[in-house]
Amino acid sequence: MSRFLSRLELEAMGFASLGADVKIDRQAVFINPDTVSLGDHCRIDAFSLISAGAEGVRIGRYVHLGASCQIFGGGGAVLLEDFSCLSGRATAYTSSVSLLSRIKNLMFNPTLPEAFRSISQGPVILRKHSGVGCGSVVLPGVEMGFGSAAGALTLVRKSLPEGVVICGNPPQVLLHRDRSELERLEEEFFAMEWGEPDI
């Protein structure tokens, strides 16, 4: 038996949309798959958890989620555009308890009503060719610009401009990636023997 689910098994899960050549490990877990859209040639590895909320999780073409990735979409939409990726054990949150509340004595436990907690919510967006390194955490409201990246074990608290690569805690800018070079590589990729996939 293949480690990846068959097409029939994928169709039976009831995704909002399902592209061609989607590879999902049998050990991956989906909560609310009816709000998850999967693009062509995406791959989700073992022990990953995709917990989609009402606004859904949209995964584009040629997107990779490494082993043990976690996406928590209860607080807003999650969008991973084409060629983006989450490396192993990376996590994206659309909702979290705010520790910066002016009211110091709120509680954290999610089993309690929101009146007792200070919640920060917002979408998480990874634009084309952006990536999150292993063990990194992306907090609510973050948009990673085209070609941007966060290296391993980085806490991404703020949106990243196009092409910016950061790493560390606190994060430091390591370099800038060139949009035209990434677009050239994409064109070269699609010009290979298999060509651009049907949409």
What are these regions (language model features)?
Residues 15, 47, 68, 181-185, ...:
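Generic hydrophobic, helix-prone segments enriched in Leu/Val/Ile
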Residues 187-193:
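C-terminal boundary and immediately downstream tail of ABC-type ATPase nucleotide-binding domains
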Residues 86-91, 149-158, 194-199:
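Short flexible/disordered coil segments
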Residues 7, 26-38, 43-142, 169-170, ...:
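Flexible, glycine/small-residue-enriched loop-and-beta-strand segment within the central core
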Residues 18-22, 60-63, 145-148:
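Short, conserved structural micro-motifs that define repeat-unit consensus positions
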Residues 22, 90, 164:
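Short, conserved active-site loop motifs that form the nucleotide-linked donor/cofactor pocket
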Residues 1-37, 41, 193-199:
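Extended, small-residue-rich solenoid/repeat segments and analogous flexible loops
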Residues 37-38, 137-186:
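C-terminal/domain-terminus segments
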